[in-house]
């Protein structure tokens, strides 16, 4: 068997074992594709054993707000209680996803970093003035929705959150816990 094929089979075995232990790993940018994969895994676990805990491990630089909120909404719809564990990085929409756990179940590893900021529009936007105005209003609505998520998750005031996300705000796991984004820091798998 060629080495590449053997590695692919090994990866399949590892992925199956992790899914069977109700662990979902989100270790990539938030895209339509990565969101669809996460949603399929969430629903597989929900349909095979509803109400049983799921651990959602996040190491993501963020990405699409719409794709991220698709995952968020599905997590909120299932009956299985979800624990989030940030390892490495949860930035931008990745940080939002880290907040979708049940209360008291938002964790990070000791060297994890969290970055929060306001949404942005990538690339170049062209069009008529009216179209640009529509885009501007939509991104402000998205910003308000993200502020609401951070306010609810942290207990901070909307004014504090709006100031915090005005620019990229980088935090260590300890700083994120003090800010209210995390409930604890994991030093062992046994802490789950």
Swiss-Prot record:
Family: Belongs to the peptidase S14 family.
Name of protein: ATP-dependent Clp protease proteolytic subunit 1
Organism: Chlamydia trachomatis serovar L2 (strain ATCC VR-902B / DSM 19102 / 434/Bu)
Subunit structure: Fourteen ClpP subunits assemble into 2 heptameric rings which stack back to back to give a disk-like structure with a central cavity, resembling the structure of eukaryotic proteasomes.
NCBIfam families in alphabetical order: PRK12553.1
Role description: Cleaves peptides in various proteins in a process that requires ATP hydrolysis. Has a chymotrypsin-like activity. Plays a major role in the degradation of misfolded proteins.
Transmembrane segments: none
Subcellular location, record wording: Cytoplasm
Keywords: Cytoplasm, Hydrolase, Protease, Serine protease
Signal peptide (residue range): none
The enzyme's E.C. designation: 3.4.21.92
Active site: 92 (nucleophile), 117
Domain of life from the UniProt record: Bacteria
Predominant cellular place of this UniProt entry's protein: cytoplasm
BP-aspect Gene Ontology terms: protein quality control for misfolded or incompletely synthesized proteins
MF term (GO), any: ATPase binding
EC class name: hydrolase
Pfam families: CLP_protease
Gene Ontology cellular component annotations, sorted alphabetically: cytoplasm; endopeptidase Clp complex
């Amino acid at each position: 068997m060629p080495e590449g094929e053997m590695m692919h089979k090994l990866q399949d075995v590892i992925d199956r074992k992790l899914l069977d232990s109700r662990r979902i790993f989100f270790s990539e940018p938030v895209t339509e594709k990565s969101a669809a994969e996460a949603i399929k895994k969430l629903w597989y676990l929900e349909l095979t054993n509803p109400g049983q805990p799921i651990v959602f491990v996040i190491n993501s630089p963020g990405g699409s707000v719409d794709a991220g909120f698709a995952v968020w909404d599905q997590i909120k719809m299932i009956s299985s209680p979800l624990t989030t564990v940030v390892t490495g990085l949860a930035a931008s929409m990745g940080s939002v996803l880290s907040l979708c756990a049940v209360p008291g179940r938002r964790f990070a590893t000791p060297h994890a970093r969290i970055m929060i900021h306001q949404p942005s529009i990538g690339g170049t936007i062209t069009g008529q003035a009216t179209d640009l105005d529509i885009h501007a209003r939509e991104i402000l609505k998205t910003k308000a929705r993200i502020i609401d998520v951070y306010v609810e998750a942290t207990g901070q005031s909307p004014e504090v959150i709006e100031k915090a996300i005005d620019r990229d705000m980088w935090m260590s796991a300890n700083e994120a816990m003090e800010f209210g984004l995390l409930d604890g820091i994991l030093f062992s798998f046994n802490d789950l």
